[in-house]
């Protein structure tokens, strides 16, 4: 039997009932099914443009044929034509409002497009259709986090956790949500759980270390940032944070060394310039060194040059004015 006959047999066997529904008449539905079969075969041959033509014909012949819209959504998504993909998946959900697959796919495309509010709406419907689906709950939580709806993000995150408590990605997300809510102790617990599942993940290590800093645990934060530099020697942010930790621990020379390393890696690290300026000024005041004081002021100016709209900008300008006299 030919490949075409194989494709036809499989698809038609699963669509017998659908194909015979008298929506626009059996002839219309059967013609649409035949065009759909052609499109599936063309897609298998990587001829997506011709497959799209067949599917568009199928939707014109039978405007209620949801499977054609669903496959159009898949093909457009594969081609990274996301607006067209969303339109097709949206049409599929309107034609078949009980299709988990189409709502989930619609949410995924909106999430890719960073249309997070629309993604939430689609994913929530997917969760209604399959409440025990881990990915649907996880992605709903992700998108709610993106739109700053942290309380609802926690709700869906916890639902996902009940389904699969061993997903590192989920615990990292929960850590991010708790951090955004300023619940830093919960954030620490979530990041620790994520790190238990992937002990060498530098992203999780950085997040946990920052959470440690926010809970005044400087030493374990420094150790984690240092571990990150062993995995990612070019991670300027890790060195910048190590510099900050050493400042908090009153080790100015180590702070200076690490801030310098951060700037060596990334000459646009405004936080490292600012922190190095603080370290120099601290050392200058301790040693009554006018030259170090001048260098500190110049570093602060460089920080503002790199990022003029940085947080606490006014405070830094006042320091520059104070020590420039």
Name these PLM-found stretches:
Residues 31-33, 66-67, 100-101, 134-135, ...:
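Helix-start (N-cap) detector for alpha-helical repeat units in TPR-like alpha-solenoids
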Residues 44-54, 79-91, 113-125, 147-159, ...:
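Structural signature of tandem alpha-helical TPR/SEL1-like repeats
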Residues 25-71, 78-80, 94, 325:
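N-terminal leader/linker segments that initiate helical-solenoid repeat arrays
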Residues 43, 70, 77, 104, ...:
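Position-specific recognition of the canonical hydrophobic site in helix A of tetratricopeptide repeat
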Residues 13-22:
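Bacterial N-terminal signal peptides
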Residues 281-285, 290-325:
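Terminal, low-structured helical/coil segments at or just beyond the last alpha-helical repeat
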Residues 37, 71, 105, 139, ...:
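Canonical tetratricopeptide repeat
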């Amino acid at each position: 039997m030919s490949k075409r006959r194989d494709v036809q047999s499989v698809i038609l066997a699963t669509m017998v009932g659908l194909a015979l529904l008298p929506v626009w008449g059996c002839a219309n539905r059967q013609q649409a099914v035949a065009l759909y079969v052609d499109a599936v075969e063309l897609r298998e041959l990587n001829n997506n443009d011709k497959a799209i033509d067949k599917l568009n014909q199928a939707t014109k012949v039978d405007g209620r044929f949801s499977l054609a819209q669903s496959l159009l959504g898949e093909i457009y998504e594969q081609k990274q034509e996301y607006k067209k993909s969303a339109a097709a998946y949206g049409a599929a959900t309107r034609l078949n409002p009980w299709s988990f697959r189409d709502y989930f796919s619609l949410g995924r495309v909106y999430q890719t497009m960073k249309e997070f509010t629309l993604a939430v709406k689609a994913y929530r419907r997917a969760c209604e259709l399959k409440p025990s689906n881990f990915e649907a709950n996880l992605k709903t939580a992700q998108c709610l986090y993106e739109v700053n709806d942290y309380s609802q993000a926690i709700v869906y995150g916890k639902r996902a956790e009940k389904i699969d408590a061993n997903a590192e990605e989920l615990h990292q997300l929960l850590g991010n949500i708790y951090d955004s809510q300023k619940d830093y102790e919960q954030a620490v617990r979530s990041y620790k759980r994520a790190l238990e599942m992937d002990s060498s993940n530098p992203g999780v290590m950085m997040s946990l270390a920052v959470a440690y800093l926010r809970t005044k645990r400087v030493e374990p934060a420094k150790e984690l940032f240092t571990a990150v530099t062993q995995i990612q020697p070019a991670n300027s942010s890790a060195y910048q944070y190590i510099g900050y930790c050493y400042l908090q621990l009153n080790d100015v020379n180590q702070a200076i060394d690490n801030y310098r390393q951060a700037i060596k890696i990334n000459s646009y690290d405004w936080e490292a310039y600012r922190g190095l300026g603080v370290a120099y000024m601290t050392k200058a005041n301790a040693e009554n060194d006018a030259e170090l004081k001048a260098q500190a002021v110049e570093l602060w100016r460089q920080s503002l040059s790199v990022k003029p709209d940085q947080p606490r900008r006014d405070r830094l300008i006042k320091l520059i004015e104070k020590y420039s006299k």
